[in-house]
Amino acid sequence: MGERTDSGSASGFGMNPTLGGIGEGATLRQIFPRLPHAEAELLGPGDDAAVVRAPDGRFVVTTDMMIHGPDFRSAWSTPHDLGWKAAMSNLADVAAMGARPTALVVAIAAPLETPVDTLLGIADGFRDACDVAAPGCGVVGGDLSVSPTLTLAVTAFGDLEDRAPVTRTGARPGDVLAVAGDLGRAGAGLWLLFRDGVSPGAVTPGEPDRERAAATRGAHPELVDAQLAPVSPIASGIVAAEGGATAMLDVSDGLVLDARRIAEASEVALRLDPVMIEREAEALRTVDPVVGDRAARFVLAGGEDHALLATFPPDRPLPVGFRPLGTVIALTDAPDGRPDALVGDTPFDSRGGWDPYADWDGNAG
């Protein structure tokens, strides 16, 4: 889909001047020219609210947050990474509905000592992510505030262009389960960062180390980039909708967990083909052999790749860019009669994915 063009490094979090030093107005005057322009924009940043075209008469709307600690570490991510990832995760949610992303509203809360260059790098990340993954989408407004913890909150809008939305509820027995995009890379990248990108002598276990993380990224760019600045196949959302997708979501929390969400919403079970999962694992090992025998686990439970997982009628060819992973089966054919995601005929495990309330540890990540 394109290449990331990083405008900064993790050291961008330690440069001057600061937000507290120049204030909100001066900061915004530097940010606005760097933001991507939305083709649907009628009135953009600078007024009390934006005005955006809604030619379909409907809006697809989604919101996602990124908070320092559970969602990112400034020692690992560049400011550009943060803007890119915040944009991409929201664009993927819009795409998963079969819509075209049209506009973003961005709110950022940051400590007073945050360098202005950090905000400029974040803005550049939004610009580049939109340019690469969703041309024509841009930032139309937002808010800037003060907080002891750097936080990004993004609301994304999309246009269905007279199509029906693709929800999680439409999967039917016999449908083909398929995916567009990468699986397992982001999870493997996070594993590498916690393995190699931390300070071995820190008082707090798992304390991120900027230099070690940069070295890890340099040694394993395909995996660490996928974690810190993922590329989602945004255009494939419309392709899937026009190709007859019956259900769809983006894989943000892990293949098994997100497949289970389709199963529960559609009241079916999803059977992942072990042969196809091994194919995905082998592809991951080809990208970087460091994953070794962990590859299948990363494919099934890694999360944050923002691939698009969809179901399609069995009598139609899969759209370009999608590859099969399994099938949809009736609950009467599931081993325990419950909506679930199975690997063959076996449930993967009790969770098999990321839950921010259950899984985050302030030390271990």
Language model feature labels by segment:
Residues V60-T63, V166-V239:
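Short, acidic (Asp/Glu-rich) active-site segment that either coordinates a divalent metal cofactor
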Residues P79-L104, D124-A133, I238, G254-I262:
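Small-aliphatic-rich amphipathic alpha-helix that forms the alpha element of a beta-alpha
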Residues E113-P115, P221-G303:
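Active-site-proximal betaalpha loop/short-helix elements
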Residues G23, P230-V231, E278, L318-G365:
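Acidic, Ser/Thr/Pro-rich beta/coil linker or hinge segments at domain junctions
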Residues P55-F59, M66, P101-D196:
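Glycine-rich anion-binding loops of enzyme active sites
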Residues M1-T78, V106, D124-A134, D361-G365:
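Extreme N-terminal cap/leader segments of soluble proteins
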Residues F157, L309-P313:
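Short hydrophobic/aromatic beta-strand micro-patches
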